[in-house]
């Protein structure tokens, strides 16, 4: 009798689940049905050996490296039609309705990557991505606020599967997670390709806090497409024997409490002036000057003076889209919290982390063990003095971290291609 009762309970639960699912499908037909049709279309194309259409939506030269190996690997595949879709972008530091062209077309021209420009400047109209009949779409950034309606994830996911790869490896915790892990975009995505298990755990924990743990099943650990490229580009041939080069990467805004640009600007200038064999390369984030002008922390005249100051042999302003060139030239990185700390680790060179608040997540804390953390000008100068003299006590620690979290044979793009074509 008990078995019969248990069976009836299970049957009732199953019926309730089916009824609930049918109800959801009825209520959310506009959400579920288009996505089911997309999935079936892709499956049919795979089974009939038709080429899959892949689109990379891109707008910024500085983070193109995330796409470089995807572009190269996918373009070689006989199963893929590859399109690079270049656009201008919106941002909170720009007036509403204004879209900025960041020069990606010129950069792609310089490296012989063909593209389609998705915006008609004369008519102020956008090319509808649907016209390209994409099967898979990769975004350079997962922020719907940067895109017009015809490129937002909610619309695009009705006719294509969205693939997320990080434009930056997130090393920070707290409020910033609200920005860098956009739930609306992740809900519309089919695949979330993540660098490593520790970052998967961080994102999963965030999903749990946001009551969206169902998104975890979308996560696939593939390695980093950026690290895959960095390893092919780093070398020591650019190092000069008699010059010690500091690469400085301060954060682009002060509202987060992490930026040390104004704290160490004069300190680093003075250090270079006091040491004739020391060079400083200042590499501002693409939004740095735009943001400081927007917030009133700098004027146009002050920005011009900074650029003029960094125009000498030993004070260099680096706005080259290819930041790995600066990696190769530098003897040490001095940086606020930034994903480039993670990428610079691949060079095996020392890193000075300019710590201001407790902001690093679990992965950032692991990397910090191999960094020289400084909290004031005196500590920064002492640390630089030691490194100029080649006193690098954390070299072995960095080697251990590299062995644990980095792979010189990183093939993230090949893994992603295999997942999407099988």
What are the residue ranges of the model-derived segments?
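Nucleotide-activated donor-dependent transferases that construct or modify glycoconjugates
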Residues: 33-61, 142, 247-250
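Membrane-proximal basic amphipathic "stem/tether" segments
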Residues: 1-48
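Nucleotide-activated donor-binding/catalytic signature segment of Leloir-type glycosyltransferases, i.e.
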Residues: 296-319
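A donor-sugar binding/catalytic signature common to diverse glycosyltransferases
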Residues: 163-164, 319-362
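Conserved catalytic-core segment of nucleotide-activated headgroup transferases in glycan assembly
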Residues: 65-70, 219, 224-302, 374, ...
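C-terminal amphipathic helix plus adjacent low-complexity
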Residues: 377-378, 382-422
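Active-site and donor-binding regions of nucleotide-sugar-utilizing enzymes
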Residues: 55-229
């Amino acid at each position: 009798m008990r078995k019969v009762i248990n069976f009836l309970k299970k049957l009732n639960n199953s019926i309730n689940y089916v009824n609930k699912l049918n109800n959801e499908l009825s209520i959310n037909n506009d959400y579920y049905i288009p996505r089911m049709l997309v999935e079936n279309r892709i499956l049919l194309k795979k089974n009939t050996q038709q080429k899959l259409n892949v689109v990379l939506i891109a707008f910024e030269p500085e983070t193109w490296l995330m796409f470089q190996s995807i572009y190269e690997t996918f373009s070689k595949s006989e199963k893929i039609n590859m399109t690079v879709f270049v656009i201008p972008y919106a941002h909170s530091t720009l007036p509403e309705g204004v879209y900025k062209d960041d020069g990606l077309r010129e950069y792609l021209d310089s490296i012989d990557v063909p593209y389609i420009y998705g915006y008609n400047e004369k008519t102020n109209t956008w090319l509808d991505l649907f016209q390209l009949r994409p099967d898979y779409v990769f975004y350079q950034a997962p922020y719907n606020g940067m895109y017009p309606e015809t490129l937002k994830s909610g619309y695009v996911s009705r006719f294509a599967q969205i693939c997320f790869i990080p434009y930056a490896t997130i090393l920070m915790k707290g409020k910033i997670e609200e920005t860098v892990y956009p739930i609306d975009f992740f809900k519309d995505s089919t695949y979330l390709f993540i660098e490593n298990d520790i970052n998967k755990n961080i994102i999963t924990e965030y999903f749990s806090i946001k009551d969206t743990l169902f998104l975890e099943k979308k996560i696939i650990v593939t390695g980093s497409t950026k690290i895959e490229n960095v390893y092919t580009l780093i070398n020591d041939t650019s190092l000069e024997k008699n010059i010690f080069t500091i690469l400085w990467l301060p954060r682009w805004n002060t509202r987060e409490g992490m930026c040390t640009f104004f704290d160490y600007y004069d300190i680093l200038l003075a250090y270079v002036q006091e040491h004739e064999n020391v060079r400083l390369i200042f590499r501002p984030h693409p939004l740095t000057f735009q943001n400081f002008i927007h917030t009133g922390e700098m004027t146009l005249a002050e920005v011009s003076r900074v650029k003029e100051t960094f125009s000498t042999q030993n004070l260099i302003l680096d706005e080259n889209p290819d930041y790995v060139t600066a990696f190769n030239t530098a003897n040490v990185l001095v940086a606020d919290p930034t994903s480039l700390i993670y990428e610079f680790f691949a060079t095996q060179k020392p890193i000075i982390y300019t710590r201001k608040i407790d902001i690093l997540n679990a992965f950032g804390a692991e990397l910090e063990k191999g960094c020289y953390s400084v909290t004031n000008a005196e500590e920064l100068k002492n640390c630089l003095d030691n490194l100029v003299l080649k006193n690098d006590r954390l070299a072995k620690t960095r080697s251990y971290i590299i062995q644990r979290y980095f792979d010189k044979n990183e093939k993230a793009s090949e893994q992603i291609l295999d997942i999407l074509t099988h």
